[in-house]
Amino acid sequence: MAITKEDILEAVAGLTVMELNDLVKAFEEKFGVSAAAVAVAGPAGAGAAAAEEKTEFDVVLSAAGDNKVGVIKVVRAITGLGLKEAKDLVDGAPKNVKEGVAKAEAEDIVKQLTEAGAKAEIK
């Protein structure tokens, strides 16, 4: 005879608050989860406020420019890609060169790409 959901609900309904607390802790340990409440996202604020809070940025290669070989070298150094993969990335511009990086690192990458003759931007 299998235990049904109704049987479980009846058993839980008869527990005290302390027993329920122990039950929740047992579930957390058994299944490796947390019963903490999930924070619900509030309404969207002003765009400027959201931009200030952004901590991860994507560096986008907009155009390779005239010095394609130099840009490929910089892309290889930044990403660790092989020659063919870096060439494909540069040829396929606009493409993301690096994703989820800190602002300072993103600015440094854009500077390197720009010095090599490419057009790059931070998003």
From Swiss-Prot:
Disulphide bridges, residue numbers: none
CDD domains, per the entry: Ribosomal_L7_L12 (cd00387)
UniProt key word Ribosomal protein: yes
GO cellular component term of the entry, any: cytosolic large ribosomal subunit
Gene Ontology annotations of biological process type: translation
Record GO terms (molecular function): mRNA binding; structural constituent of ribosome
Gene3D superfamilies associated with the record: 3.30.1390.10, Single helix bin
Keywords from the UniProt entry: Ribonucleoprotein, Ribosomal protein
Top-level taxonomic group: Bacteria
Purpose: Forms part of the ribosomal stalk which helps the ribosome interact with GTP-bound translation factors. Is thus essential for accurate translation.
PANTHER family per record: 39S RIBOSOMAL PROTEIN L12, LARGE RIBOSOMAL SUBUNIT PROTEIN BL12M
The protein's assembly and partners: Homodimer. Part of the ribosomal stalk of the 50S ribosomal subunit. Forms a multimeric L10(L12)X complex, where L10 forms an elongated spine to which 2 to 4 L12 dimers bind in a sequential fashion. Binds GTP-bound translation factors.
HAMAP family in the record: Ribosomal_bL12
Similarity section: Belongs to the bacterial ribosomal protein bL12 family.
Name the UniProt record assigns to this protein: Large ribosomal subunit protein bL12
Source organism of this protein record: Chromobacterium violaceum (strain ATCC 12472 / DSM 30191 / JCM 1249 / CCUG 213 / NBRC 12614 / NCIMB 9131 / NCTC 9757 / MK)
Gene: rplL
